[in-house]
């Protein structure tokens, strides 16, 4: 029997390198897929509709909320983000492992609604490095950067309830640590026991 897909929920303060890490780990594992979220924010340079996000209007987003189409959604820095229930159910049934690159509010909602998710928090090495990375983003204004820095302290405090914490100081090391989490979680007894029981007639 095919095992259910694993949900890897990854959160971080803006500038910690979460999105880059997620893209790297998806390139490494062919059966790992990125969950494409819906958002009301404007696309950044190089972002593609349907690949990075589904970019929709606020009216469209509210309509999806009213219809109960989101497994989780939240407003972050003035923009709305959401994960569709259909995406999660399709991957669970087909055995596809899914990376969810979402904020803390959304992660909390998922933890309350779904069992078996793996919660991973990505940290920058320091506040100083976080500010340096955010200042390097040409797409963000000084006001946006200041708001993100102010929010980071509260976000980092929330890391205590995640299953894993990875400090993204040296990128290659952070990738290896994230790889280790993915491999270990796939081997958890409760995920593979049904298959093993059938294969070795343990019933």
From Swiss-Prot:
Q: Does the keyword Transferase apply?
A: yes
Q: Which residues bind ATP?
A: 12-19
What are the GO MF terms of this UniProt record? ATP binding; guanylate kinase activity
Give the catalytic activity. GMP + ATP = GDP + ADP
What Gene Ontology terms describe where this protein resides (cellular component)? cytosol
Q: Which InterPro entries match?
A: GK/Ca_channel_bsu, Guanylate_kin-like_dom, Guanylate_kinase, Guanylate_kinase_CS, P-loop_NTPase
Where in or outside the cell it occurs: the entry states: Cytoplasm
According to the UniProt record, what class of enzyme is this?
transferase
EC numbers for this chain: 2.7.4.8
Q: Which residues form the Guanylate kinase-like domain?
A: 5-183
Keyword entries, A-Z: ATP-binding, Cytoplasm, Kinase, Nucleotide-binding, Transferase
Keyword Transport set for record: no
What SMART domains does the record point to?
GuKc
Q: What is its main location?
A: cytoplasm
Instruction: Outline what the protein does.
Output: Essential for recycling GMP and indirectly, cGMP.
Annotated PANTHER family: GUANYLATE KINASE (PTHR23117:SF13), GUANYLATE KINASE-RELATED (PTHR23117)
Q: Which family does it belong to?
A: Belongs to the guanylate kinase family.
Q: What is this protein called?
A: Guanylate kinase
Q: Which species is this record about? A: Geobacter metallireducens (strain ATCC 53774 / DSM 7210 / GS-15)
Record gene name: gmk
């Amino acid at each position: 029997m095919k095992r259910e897909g694993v949900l890897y929920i990854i959160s971080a303060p803006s500038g910690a390198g979460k999105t880059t890490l997620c893209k790297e780990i998806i390139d490494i594992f062919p059966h790992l897929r990125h969950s494409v979220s819906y958002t009301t924010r404007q696309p950044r340079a190089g972002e593609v509709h349907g690949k990075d996000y589904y970019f929709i209007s606020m009216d469209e987003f509210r309509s999806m909320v009213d219809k109960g189409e989101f497994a989780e959604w939240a407003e972050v820095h003035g923009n709305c983000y959401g994960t569709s229930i259909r995406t999660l159910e399709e991957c669970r049934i087909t055995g596809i492992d899914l990376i969810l690159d979402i904020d803390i509010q959304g992660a909390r909602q998922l933890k309350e609604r779904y069992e078996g998710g793996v919660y991973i928090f990505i940290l920058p090495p320091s506040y100083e490095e976080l500010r340096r990375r955010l200042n390097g983003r040409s797409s963000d204004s000084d006001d946006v950067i200041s708001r993100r820095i102010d929010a980071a302290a509260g976000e980092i405090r929330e890391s205590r309830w995640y299953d894993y914490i990875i400090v993204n100081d040296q990128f290659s090391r952070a990738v290896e640590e994230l790889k280790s989490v993915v491999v270990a979680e796939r081997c958890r007894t409760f995920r593979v026991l049904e298959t093993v029981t059938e294969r070795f007639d343990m019933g």
